[in-house]
């Protein structure tokens, strides 16, 4: 019983954090992010449904915005949880440098495209 109540409290806390944060990611932006990454941002798989993953977790002050969201496969998203991304990549023995280089390039492209888009 205690486990369920802890899970319920954690879910309520997460719901409050998400509701309190400024989350301005639109469906069109999410589609553009998925197209730019062409698969999981972490492991590169292109199979399955991609989930929205915050590079900086919501619990650490992250938000659902163009510059913080990447597509992640289910296993990577569940494994990363709310860990710091570079430490998690090292532990999983994934290519940290490749991720960071792609993240910076794709993020800049998406932000530039959004700057030119009408509001």
Language model features: what each stretch is:
Residues 2-39, 98-107, 111-114:
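Short, charged surface segments at domain edges that flank catalytic/cofactor-binding sites
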Residues 67, 78-119:
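A detector for short metal-coordination/catalytic motifs
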Residues 39-74, 80-92:
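Histidine-centered nuclease catalytic patch
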């Amino acid at each position: 019983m205690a486990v369920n109540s802890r899970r319920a409290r954690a879910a309520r806390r997460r719901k409050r954090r998400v509701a309190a944060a400024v989350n301005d990611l639109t469906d069109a932006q999410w589609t553009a992010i998925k197209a730019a990454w062409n698969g999981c941002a972490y492991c590169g798989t292109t199979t399955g449904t991609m989930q929205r993953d915050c590079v900086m977790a919501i619990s650490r002050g992250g938000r659902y915005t163009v510059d913080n969201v990447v597509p992640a496969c289910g296993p990577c998203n569940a494994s990363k949880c709310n860990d710091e991304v570079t430490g998690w990549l090292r532990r999983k023995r994934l290519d940290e440098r490749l991720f960071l280089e792609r993240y910076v390039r794709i993020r800049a492209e998406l932000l530039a495209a959004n700057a030119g888009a009408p509001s």
